[in-house]
Amino acid sequence: MLWHVYLRKGTVLVPTVAKTDAGFFIDVEPVAVVESTNRQEIISAIKAAIGRGNPIVATPTRAEFPKPVVLKYANVKSWATFEKNAFCWTVKKNASAFELHSPRMNVPKPWEEGPVKIETFDTEAAIDILSCSIADQVRGTV
């Protein structure tokens, strides 16, 4: 399972992440849009997205592959423009734990592959602790 939390210019975007029949993940509606200063709403949006799981969707063909759903909420037309001023936290869940992959900070291109901070949450309250950790990191990034 997988989820994304994006921060761009003071706005937090938390899309639903669907899994295609082919096995890859794409961001889909609904997308929560929250001000980065509102810790409680960030936490609620993350919990809601995780609660929705990863719905299964048909694999789009190359011709019908949609633009990233978060672009319209960020008021940009291209992924390249979006990622210039955005950070992405990725949450992965396996059988026993959640992993939080935090973005590289203070680097020219934080989206490039490279070392990231990975935290593991395997307690009973993992979703609560994970959501609070992301909200605090988001607020510390602004």
Residue map of PLM features:
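Intrinsically disordered, low-complexity regulatory segments enriched in Ser/Thr/Pro
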Residues: 1-37, 93-132, 136, 140
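Negatively charged, low-complexity tracts enriched in Asp/Glu with abundant Ser/Thr
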Residues: 35-87, 107, 111-117
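A short, charged
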Residues: 48-56, 60, 128-142
